[in-house]
Structure formats: structure tokens, C-alpha cells
């Protein structure tokens, strides 16, 4: 049974295995005044236990009515009935080992009849998907449950066992009232909010002992603010977005949008795997890194010019690039709010309710089906979505595109690094004033847009202050701008309603 069980972390298998192998016989009785009584009568002359179904039925009925206190000398004759004399029998006053009590939970929980899906075709009951407790329970609940279930059911009561470490103070000491280092979760929630406490719990390696303190939570609070800012940006950038503006032909989208959808599909697959592996530390890290590095520091930064400046009288729905950007933002919103919901419970509800005040709770939504988010007009019953579709298969697998943009991002980082000295020296105030020379300029990439700079040329590495004039609308320094304050070609086109 141990070999058939999944253990998280894997070392739990050897731990419980060695304990079971070396344990002595289990004596189930305990001589205690309080507990679940062993309801047996013993013949005073022969020392034999009385095994009479009618007697047992009367004891069970009394226990259902009055609880375990019904097992008393005063009611002994009532249970024995007319067939036996109470004076001839000793009522056992021992109780069951409390670990036997806990080890029976699978029987009265899983086999309670409340979950029909757990019932097998042969009338038996499937094991629980997961038992979750502290690492000390390899000697306790996990082991007693295993022994009791194997002895009576012939199988482990669980498919997987997950053990967690314990929470220490900021210095790594065990919390104790005598040391005065205890921390109340209620106080933490009052000071930081429940979502920050949840984010901390899911960010640590819970399989080991972990620390908590004000400085640690301050770092988590900073991470939370970055995630919250991602949703704040999405809500603002999607204001007024509708189906008329939506673009569903991904092939017609700019390469940057296709790249971001591919990254999202890759994130989706990794998050699914993290959940399957109970690796919530990886889950929160992947989510935070995507929001901070791929979105805020890259995608949002590049496309803010398009968002603000590609809308005007001549383009009431926005340019095709702006429409593609907002279409991708909508997909990102629907995916990310679902990804964040198990972690940032209240924030996700707030975000969802802000955009869709009449749509019910975000926690009633299922895991996002990326293909159906991206291609909503292609119809079909969402309940019939294939497994491949659910994995966003149509958005993944473009290795060439991902590798190309990984190189572009690497070059972008180098350009940003070379611009910083000019900014510190106040030679330029913004990257928009920088003119860049690259040794290997690809012809199909709008480097000015990606780097958020003025003109980009092919040549030896160099960054200088541009002599181009500044567009009065988008603030980009471009060759076609005739004087500071005049308009660039793009802005003239967008504003020309004739």
C-alpha cells in the first residue's frame, strides 16, 4: 500500500515505511477515563468476551441516543437483556487508543454516502485523493489510518499524502508563549490583509519549516502590490473594450501579440503542472514573474504608446495594432484573474467584480480554456472542449517565435543598460531621446517601438542623444517631425477624420 501511494515530498515514503517496519504490535486499548469506550462484556468465570449481536445492537442504539456516556454500569443489565445476568459479566472500562479513532476517519467520512462518486462499481469506496498534515503525522494519523484501512479494507485510505513543516518566528525559533514569540494570524490579517498572508503561505516551501515575521511579510506585501498593479493596469487599459473591437484572427496579429499569447499558453501548462505537483511555491513564483517581467516590465511598457496614441477620429476603434493589443489584454485578464483566485482570494473577487459587477463570484469560474478565450467566435459547447484545447495547444509550440523574441528581449536589455549612463548624466531625460546603433538589426522588427527609443540604425554598438524633433502628441523623436511640437506621421493619420 505504501508503494502505491504518492508522497509529497517523496522522502515521506521512506519515513513512514521505516516506522511501520519497525513498529511493535498495536495494543488498541488504553486505561483512561475519557475517550471512546471499548464496549465489551467479559464472562467473569471463563474470561471470554460476550459476542451477541442483540447485545451489540442495544449498545449501538443507546450510544446513538446518548453518546459514549451511555456505556455505564447502571445500564449493563439493559444491554445484556433477559438472556444474561449483569453480575456474571465485567463491563470493560478501557478506551480505544485515540490514534485508532483518527485512523477510522476514512470509514465514517468517505463511506458516509454523501459522495456517491466515491462508490466503486463493486460497492466499495475509492480512497481519498489526499491526506494533508504536519510531518509529525507519519507516526500518527497517516500511520494509524494506513494500518486500520489495510487491515479492514485491504488498501491504503489515501492516494497521496502531503506533509508540511512548521511555522517558526523570524529568527527560526519555534513559537512558544514562554518565549513571547508567538504571532497571531488574526493580527497579521488585520495588519496586512488575508491575501498577503495567503500569498506568504503559498510562496514558502511548505514541505520544510518556514519563518514568518514583519520583514518577511513586508517583502510579500511588495510582491502583492506588484500583482495588484498588474490587475489595476488591465482594468484601466480594457475600459470600454467590446466584441466589435476584438480581433480573433491570431495569425493577423502583430508578432509581439502572438509571442505574448504563446508565453501565456506556456504559463498555463506550467501552472497546471505545479498544481498537480502540489508545488504552490512554483505556482506563485511563475505567476508573479509573468506579471512582473513579461507583462509590466516588457509588454505593457512597449504597448503603452499604442494604447494611448493609436486611437483618434480616424480610428474610433483604434488601429489594428491597438485592437490586437486590447484583445490580448482581455485574454490575459480572464486567464490571470482565474490563476490568481486560489492565491489572492479577496483581490481576485474585487478585480472580477469591478469589471463584471453582475457576473457572480470569480470563484465559481473554472480553470481558463485559453483556446476558447482567444477564439470565442468559433463556437462550440465549452463543456465539450477537448483536452488539447484546454491546454491552449493552438497557441503553444512556436519555438522559432519564442526563441526569436527571447533574443530581442536580450538585446533590449543591453540597449537599456547602455541608455542608463546617458540618463544619469542628464544627457537625455527619457529613452525616447536616445538614438541607437545595432550591429545586427533584423529587418522585420520595429526596434524603435520595442526599445522605446528614437531611430535605430544598423552599425557598431552606440547610443547617442537624437537630433530628431519631438512629436507633440506621442513624444516620440522621429525623422518626419519637422519641429518640436509638430506631429509624426502616425499621429496625423489617427487624427485625420477625413
Ranges and model annotations:
Residues 39, 467-470, 484-487:
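Short metal-coordination and nucleic-acid-contact micro-motifs, chiefly zinc-binding Cys/His arrays
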Residues 42, 89, 241-272, 300-378, ...:
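Acidic, turn-prone loop/beta-hairpin segments
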Amino acid at each position: 500500500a505504501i508503494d502505491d501511494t504518492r508522497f509529497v515530498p517523496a522522502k515521506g515514503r521512506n519515513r513512514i515505511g521505516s516506522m511501520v517496519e519497525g513498529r511493535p504490535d498495536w495494543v488498541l486499548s488504553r486505561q483512561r477515563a475519557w475517550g471512546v469506550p471499548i464496549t465489551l462484556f467479559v464472562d467473569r468465570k471463563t474470561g471470554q468476551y460476550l459476542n451477541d449481536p442483540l447485545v451489540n445492537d442495544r449498545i449501538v442504539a443507546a450510544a446513538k441516543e446518548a453518546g459514549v456516556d451511555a456505556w455505564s454500569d447502571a445500564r449493563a443489565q439493559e444491554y445484556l437483556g433477559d438472556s444474561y445476568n449483569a453480575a456474571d459479566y465485567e463491563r470493560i472500562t478501557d478506551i480505544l487508543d485515540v490514534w485508532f479513532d483518527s485512523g477510522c476517519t476514512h470509514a465514517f467520512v468517505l463511506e458516509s454516502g454523501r459522495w456517491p462518486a466515491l462508490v466503486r462499481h463493486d460497492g466499495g469506496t475509492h480512497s481519498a485523493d489526499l491526506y494533508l498534515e504536519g510531518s509529525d503525522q507519519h507516526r500518527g494519523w497517516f500511520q494509524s489510518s494506513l494500518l486500520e484501512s489495510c487491515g479492514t479494507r485491504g488498501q491504503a485510505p489515501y492516494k497521496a499524502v502531503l506533509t508540511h513543516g512548521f511555522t517558526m518566528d523570524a529568527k527560526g525559533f519555534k513559537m512558544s508563549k514562554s518565549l513571547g514569540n508567538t504571532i497571531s494570524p488574526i493580527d497579521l490579517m488585520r495588519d496586512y490583509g488575508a491575501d498577503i498572508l495567503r500569498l506568504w503561505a503559498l510562496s514558502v516551501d511548505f514541505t520544510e519549516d518556514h519563518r514568518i515575521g514583519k520583514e518577511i511579510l513586508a517583502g510579500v506585501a511588495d510582491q502583492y502590490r506588484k500583482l495588484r498593479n498588474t490587475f489595476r493596469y488591465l482594468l484601466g487599459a480594457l475600459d470600454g473594450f467590446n466584441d466589435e473591437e476584438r480581433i480573433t484572427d491570431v495569425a493577423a496579429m502583430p508578432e509581439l501579440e502572438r509571442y505574448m499569447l504563446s508565453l501565456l499558453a506556456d504559463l498555463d501548462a506550467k501552472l497546471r503542472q505545479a498544481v498537480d505537483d502540489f508545488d504552490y511555491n512554483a505556482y506563485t513564483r511563475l505567476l508573479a514573474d509573468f506579471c512582473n517581467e513579461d507583462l509590466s516590465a516588457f509588454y505593457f511598457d512597449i504597448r503603452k504608446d499604442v494604447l494611448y496614441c493609436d486611437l483618434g477620429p480616424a480610428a474610433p476603434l483604434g488601429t489594428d495594432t491597438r485592437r490586437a493589443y486590447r484583445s490580448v489584454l482581455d485574454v490575459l485578464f480572464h486567464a490571470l484573474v482565474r490563476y490568481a483566485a486560489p492565491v489572492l482570494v479577496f483581490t481576485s473577487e474585487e478585480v472580477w467584480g469591478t469589471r463584471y459587477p453582475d457576473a457572480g463570484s470569480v470563484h465559481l469560474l473554472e480553470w481558463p480554456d485559453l483556446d476558447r478565450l482567444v477564439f470565442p467566435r468559433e463556437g462550440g459547447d465549452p463543456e465539450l472542449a477537448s483536452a488539447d484545447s484546454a491546454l491552449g495547444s493552438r497557441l503553444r509550440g512556436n519555438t522559432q517565435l519564442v526563441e526569436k523574441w527571447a533574443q530581442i528581449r536580450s538585446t533590449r536589455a543591453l540597449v537599456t543598460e547602455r541608455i542608463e549612463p546617458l540618463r544619469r548624466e542628464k544627457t537625455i531625460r527619457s529613452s525616447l531621446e536616445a538614438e541607437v546603433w545595432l550591429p545586427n538589426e533584423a529587418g522585420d522588427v520595429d526596434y524603435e517601438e520595442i526599445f522605446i527609443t528614437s531611430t535605430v540604425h544598423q552599425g557598431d554598438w552606440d547610443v547617442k542623444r537624437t537630433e530628431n524633433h519631438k512629436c507633440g502628441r506621442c513624444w516620440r523623436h522621429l525623422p518626419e517631425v519637422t519641429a518640436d511640437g509638430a506631429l509624426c506621421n502616425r499621429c496625423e493619420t489617427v487624427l485625420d477624420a477625413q
